[in-house]
Curated annotation (Swiss-Prot):
SMART domains according to UniProt: AAA
Signal sequence, start to end: none
GO MF terms, alphabetically ordered: ATP binding; ATP hydrolysis activity
The protein, known as: Autoinducer 2 import ATP-binding protein LsrA
SUPFAM superfamilies noted in UniProt: P-loop containing nucleoside triphosphate hydrolases
Family in the record: Belongs to the ABC transporter superfamily. AI-2 autoinducer porter (TC 3.A.1.2.8) family.
Organism field: Yersinia pseudotuberculosis serotype O:3 (strain YPIII)
Keyword Repeat in annotation: yes
Polar residues bias: start-end ranges: 510-521
Matching Pfam families: ABC_tran (PF00005)
Domain annotation ABC transporter: ranges: 12-240, 266-506
């Protein structure tokens, strides 16, 4: 008889996993397999069940039914500690570092002595091209650097199964390239990677196998090469997405007591004029934004975009220069006064600085009004406000008192936008609005931002996704090392030009530009 070679079992096999919360089914008998040396991409809309499934595999949540096997052996009563011992590590979408500990302490936290090798850590950092100061507190890092620290924690643990939840959402193209190189090195060692992403080109570049989740089940699964991009999108969003908000949504979205309608609707004066502003992380910034205009702010991580936004909002002090909002100098104003004047900021990290995760949805959506009016709340009014934004933004939730942390990432982002809109902005600063958001929710957010601009709100749009910047902005300012390297509009706005300018090149474009923000504006580049 011919000798038959036994096929080795999968690295990870999940069979019949189901889960429900408060009677709501979120996972429906899921089967999922990961082979050694394989990247298995996981796609799905916000709320499809991706994060819940991964939390079950990582031991954070128990399944209601089903079996998890690793190398053919069943894993019962998984906990995070037991999962780590088995070589399963989840790198979360939102970094969960200890803010007061150093970068090095975070990377080595609770590592067994035989794994806490500083030479190995230094080599991994070199492989990733990281130049982090290991002695600084993790809380002082930008989100992209915090994400790299989370990835380092997984790599240091010699993980056999590495679950990456939107790992490139805040990374530059160069950082993404280095991360992918490191992943390929791990694959050669037999490590299996679950790669959760909404960036379809990255999935095609990296993943051997893809599964698409929808409504708590697997809607599509197979070799990545067997499916077109349209196949994947249709599996995620079976109902065709409309190209714009419906008339009904626009009606619900109309800003209450729109400041622009109340004041100089026909004024040609800019909503905001920034003149020679300097502060921590940036210098000599000058630009202005008109009512109804979307001004893109592009640049690599560390260029000073978030620092500039936080200074405009009053979270950081300016060292020199002036900020004029509607002809009023707000440079010395506190944040609360700027908010009352109509300057509203949607921060990059929605969980750390944007939303109160354990507070009810209805309270969160009116939180900026609470800041202005005190802590006395009006539950009926809050419920009506939340219902209005639910209809306008298609926010999905079960009940008004539901804690924010129970929402999917895309619905959290929509709630944060609703919170900012309820403050009735003249100027809305939006920092990375689609980070970690799926294809359909991203489209919703784009249409939402355009509809806000149509109501004559001025918008500063900050994003690391250059295609997104080109798609959304009327003009783009490109920052490099804390200064504006140039301004682009019209046909001159393209990803290639922005990328080169973000890395410090002065390119020949149709719009005049200068080496500093002041010179760019004086030449008409930002007028």
């Amino acid at each position: 008889m011919p000798h038959t070679v036994a096929t080795p079992p999968p690295l990870l096999q999940v069979r019949g996993i189901s889960k429900q919360f408060s009677g709501v089914v979120v996972l429906k008998s899921i089967d999922f397999t990961l082979q050694p040396g394989q990247v298995h991409a996981l796609l799905g809309g916000n709320g499809a069940g991706k994060s819940t499934l991964m939390k079950i595999i990582a031991g954070i949540l128990p399944p209601d039914t089903g079996v998890i096997e690793m190398n053919g052996q069943p894993c019962f009563n998984l906990t995070p500690a037991k999962a780590h011992q088995l070589g399963i590590y989840l790198v979360p979408q939102e970094p969960m570092l200890f803010a007061n500990l150093s970068v090095q302490e975070n990377i080595l936290f609770r590592l067994p002595k035989h794994q806490a090798d500083k030479k190995k850590m230094a080599q991994l950092l070199k492989n990733l091209g990281c130049h982090l100061d290991l002695s600084v507190s993790a809380g002082s890092l930008e989100v992209a650097d915090q994400q790299l620290v989370e990835i380092m924690r997984g790599l240091m643990r010699d993980s056999r199964i590495l679950i990456l939840d939107e790992p490139t959402a805040s990374l530059t193209p160069a950082e993404t390239h280095r991360l992918f190189s490191q992943i390929r090195m791990l694959l050669q060692q037999g490590v299996g990677v679950v790669f959760i992403s909404h960036k379809l080109p990255e999935i095609r570049q990296l993943a051997d196998w893809v599964s698409v989740m929808r409504d708590g089940g697997i809607a599509l699964s197979g070799a990545t090469a067997d499916f077109s991009t349209e196949d994947m999108i249709q599996a995620m969003t079976p109902e065709a997405q409309k190209g714009a908000l419906t008339d009904s949504q626009k009606l619900w979205l109309e800003l209450p007591g729109n400041r622009r309608a109340q004041s100089r609707a026909q004024s040609q004066q800019p909503v905001i004029h920034v003149h020679d502003l300097s502060g921590e992380g940036f210098a000599h910034i000058s630009f202005h934004v008109q009512a109804g205009e979307i001004l893109g702010l592009a640049g690599v991580v560390g260029a000073g975009r978030t620092e500039l936004a936080e200074t405009l909002y009053g979270l950081r002090p300016a060292s020199t220069g002036n900020v004029i909002l509607e002809e009023v100098n707000i440079t010395a104003m506190k944040t609360a006064n700027r908010l009352a004047a109509g300057l509203v900021y949607l921060p990059e990290d929605r969980q750390a600085s944007g939303l109160y995760l354990d507070a009810p949805l209805s309270w969160n959506v009116c939180a900026l009004a609470h800041d202005r009016q005190g802590l006395w709340t009006q539950p009926a009014q809050e419920a009506a406000v939340l219902e209005r934004y639910r209809r306008a933004l298609n926010i999905k939730f079960s009940h008004l008192e539901q804690p924010v942390r129970t929402l999917s990432g895309g619905n959290q982002q929509k709630l944060l936008i609703a919170k900012c809109l309820e403050a009735n902005p003249l100027l809305l600063i939006i920092d990375e609005p689609t980070r970690g958001v799926d294809v359909s929710a991203r489209s919703d957010i784009y249409q939402l931002i355009r509809s806000i601009a149509e109501q004559q709100v001025a918008i500063i749009f900050i994003s690391s996704d250059l295609e997104e910047v080109v798609q959304m902005a009327d003009r783009v300012l490109v920052m490099h090392q804390g200064e504006i390297n140039g301004a682009l509009s019209g046909a001159a706005m393209n990803v290639d030009t922005i990328m080169h300018m973000a890395f410090g090149e002065h390119r020949s474009v149709s719009e005049p530009q200068g080496g500093t923000a002041s010179s760019a504006e004086n030449k008409g580049a930002s007028c």
